[in-house]
Regions:
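Chymotrypsin/trypsin-fold serine protease catalytic domain
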Residues: 145, 160-229
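Terminal interaction modules at protein C-ends
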Residues: 133, 155, 255, 272-279
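Solvent-exposed loop/turn segments at secondary-structure junctions
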Residues: 92-93, 106-107, 116-119, 135-137, ...
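N-terminal low-complexity, Pro/Thr-rich disordered segments
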Residues: 3-12, 17-86, 265-288
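Catalytic histidine site
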Residues: 76-133, 216-220, 252
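Catalytic nucleophile loop of clan PA
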Residues: 230-251
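Structural recognition of the beta-strand scaffold that forms the well-ordered cores
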Residues: 85, 109-111, 165-168, 198-199, ...
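Conserved catalytic-core segment of clan PA serine endopeptidases
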Residues: 69-81, 87-90, 127-174
Length: 288
């Protein structure tokens, strides 16, 4: 079962002849015995999304006929450019988690939460990453997920202290690596926690990202907490970026939409990143 409260109510359906209420979806009821903390939204039937990421269906908040502000393309090299949404099957499908481009020799890696994706080869899947996505537009394009790397303690045992994943992306239609287009953030795996961080995530019920800055709190040797209102399902995988621009956490869950958690990125994250880097570099188009 997921780690975030699963939506169980039905939204009001749009009334005929001019009503502008949102179209309703019915989400599957949660199992009574399971914890409810995940912030991943259900991505329909894609083989690339993990079971936890499939349990809370997104509900679009924009009413039929409503207008949204135009998308603005952020300049490359900043978080607004290299942070994006994960989609099950192109931009016409649901977005269910958030991911961030991370600097790597192959220039083709993103980091997200482990419960967002399935470990292993995903070359036959359909999930894509859309950096800087907003209002139905992906200004930089989309990149297909090829391979997912997770710690065995998460992939086989779902230990929350290891809820982290890296994904290798295929080149886009023009043969470009994602980092060459959007820029990327540096991953810090020295175990930093309890610092001011800025977090950008994609709520599943919206078509624009949500950003907040606050001071994280170290909860234990392996967990840290970030208190900021309105980080619901879909924001799983959001990078916690410190003031020096480095990623020191990745949003994995929270008991409410106002409390978010991350593992402390220590030795296990360094080992996993090394594994992903080796695989991604070997598979990069230029062999870099």
């Amino acid at each position: 079962m997921d780690k975030r409260t699963v939506v169980t109510a039905v939204l009001c359906a749009a009334a005929a002849l001019g009503a502008s209420a949102a179209v309703a979806e019915l989400a599957p009821p949660p199992e009574a015995s399971a914890p409810v903390r995940a912030k991943a939204a259900q991505p329909s039937t894609s083989s690339q999304a993990s079971p936890r990421a499939q349990e809370a269906r997104p509900q679009l908040s924009a009413a039929p006929g409503s207008t949204l502000p135009p998308a603005v393309t952020p300049p490359p090299g900043g978080p607004a450019a290299f942070t994006g949404a994960l989609f099950t099957d192109g931009l016409d499908s649901d977005h269910f988690c958030t991911a961030t481009v991370v600097q790597s020799p192959g220039r083709n890696l993103i980091v997200t939460a482990g419960h967002c994706l399935m470990d292993g080869d995903q070359s036959d899947g359909t999930a894509v990453f859309a950096p800087a996505y907003a209002n139905g537009v992906a200004p930089y394009g989309t990149w297909k997920i090829q391979q997912v790397y997770e710690d065995d303690r998460w992939a086989e045992g779902t230990d929350d202290d290891f809820d982290l994943a890296f994904a290798r992306l295929a080149p886009d239609d023009r043969g470009r690596a994602v980092e060459d287009v959007t820029g990327a953030a540096v991953l810090d795996t020295t175990g930093r926690a309890g610092e001011e961080v800025t977090v950008t995530g994609y709520p599943a019920d919206r078509k624009v990202p949500r950003t907040c800055t606050a001071v994280a709190v170290r909860e234990s040797a392996t967990q840290q907490r970030f208190d900021c209102a309105d980080f619901p399902g879909g924001t799983s995988g959001s990078a916690w970026i410190a003031r020096d621009g480095k990623i020191i956490g990745v949003l994995t869950g929270g008991d409410t939409d106002d409390v978010s958690t991350s593992t402390v990125l220590g030795d296990y994250a360094a080992s996993l990143f090394a594994k992903a880097t080796a695989g991604a570099k070997a598979a990069s188009p230029a062999g870099r």
